[in-house]
Structures are given as C-alpha cells and as structure tokens.
Design a protein with these regions (language model features):
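Short, solvent-exposed loop/turn segments at the edges of secondary structure
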Residues: 120-123, 150-153, 160, 174-178
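Conserved hydrophobic/aromatic beta-strand scaffold that supports enzyme active sites
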Residues: 25, 155-157, 182
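Glycine/threonine-rich beta-strand-loop-alpha-helix active-site module
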Residues: 131, 142-168
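Gly/Ser-rich catalytic/binding loops embedded in alpha/beta enzyme cores
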Residues: 1-143
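A short helix-breaking turn/cap at a secondary-structure junction
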Residues: 159-214
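Residues forming well-ordered secondary-structure scaffolds
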Residues: 75-79, 122-123, 153, 185-188, ...
Length: 214
C-alpha cells in the first residue's frame, strides 16, 4: 500500500531522497516469512519507516542533502538504523532534508497544499508520513527541524530530551543542540518507535544514562 501511494504521489510531494521499491519489498517478504515460521518478531515488525538523509544506512546512500556527498554510501549503520532493523522495521529509504539539515531548501512539497512548504529541515520525513507514504519516520532537530514540519504537515512529531536517542552515525550540525526525533500519525505510533530508539549508546558521549526513563 505504501509503495502504491508513493507511485501515485511522489512525483508531486517529493518526500524521498532515495527509494528502492524492490529492496523495500524484499524486506517485507522476509518479514512475512519470519512471521510464518513462528520466529520471534520485534515491536516494529514489517512496519514501513523512512530515515532522514543525515542518518547513516549501510545499504543505502546517505548524502546529507548535499551534492558534496553525492553517492556516499556509509560502511556501517547508524545506531538508529541498527535499532530499527533489530526491531523488524522495513526501512523504505532516505527522506529529503535541507542541505546538512540547515541551509539550501529541499524539493519536498506540503502534501496538503503543493504550493506550500512542509517546513524544514526534516521535510521529507514529515511530508511522507502525512501523505501515508510510510507509517513512521525519523528526523532530527537542531533549531526547529522536528516540530516545525510536524506542525506544517499536520502530524505528530516528538523531539525528545537531549541525550535520549543516539546520534552516532548522524551528520553533526551543533553537538549541544542536535536531537534525533520521530514522526507518526498517532501518539501511540510515536510511543512505539520512540521506545525502540531510546536505548543507551556509548558511541554518543552525550547520551543519558537511562534514556527510556521518565
């Protein structure tokens, strides 16, 4: 259903920086097989998720919204991507960001009115969820880059307390202010993905000792 929606709407909304439908389907089929075989499943088993293009994924480009990083393919996953995979998520692709989550505007349009901005910098993540192209997504905020797109696109966005979600493998902008965050269409959806990502990570020196508490 998500891929059908993307085929219909992506030419207008332009939420994706990178999308491989065949790979997305391969992940979904593998999730189906795992379920049929009675193997253990995670809290996001088979759920389609998008990741902002400033967060590393080993099997997809991460270009930070910049021509300077065109074609860049990280050798390893970010902590966020690894946690999502371990939870069973289907990582659909990478969502559009302004350049380095700061400067040159991205191509994404507001799905409710294509003449309007979806907000930035996490524009693709918010617009894609609002347009039903994915169920959940991950963005980031240094100034207002999570809460602004959520407001503009009419969905729920959660920017948690600093040090709650690991930034290991995320393009840095301002260390004291960089926050990963999540988008969903319901509060229950936000809680589901946030619980997966709120895990202490020694690779991020600013992580709280018990990020899931409180």
């Amino acid at each position: 259903a998500c891929l059908d929606r993307i085929k219909l709407r992506e030419p207008d909304v332009q939420a994706w920086a990178y999308l491989d439908p065949d790979y997305a389907m391969a992940q979904a089929r593998a999730a189906d097989v795992q379920l049929k075989e009675g193997k253990g499943v995670g809290p996001l088993h088979g759920v389609p998720v998008g990741i902002k293009d400033v967060i590393d994924t080993a099997d997809m480009p991460t270009e930070n919204g910049s021509k300077l990083f065109a074609g860049r393919r990280p050798a390893t996953d970010s902590t966020i991507a690894k946690l999502l995979r371990d939870a069973g998520a289907v990582i659909m692709g990478k969502t559009v960001t302004t350049e380095f989550a700061l400067s040159a505007p991205g191509k994404t349009k507001n799905p409710h009115d294509l003449t309007r901005t979806p907000g930035g910098s996490s524009q693709g993540s918010a617009a894609g969820v609002a347009d039903y192209q994915m169920a959940l997504s991950v963005g980031s905020q240094t100034g207002g880059s999570m809460i602004r797109p959520a407001s503009f696109c009419g969905i729920y966005g959660y920017k948690p307390t600093f040090g709650t979600i690991s930034r290991a493998g995320m393009c840095p902008l301002a260390r004291p202010l960089d926050h990963p965050g999540v988008y969903g269409r319901t509060l229950a959806d936000l809680a589901l993905i946030a619980d997966v990502l709120m895990v202490s990570d020694p690779a991020d020196l600013d992580m709280r000792a018990n990020p899931g508490a409180g």
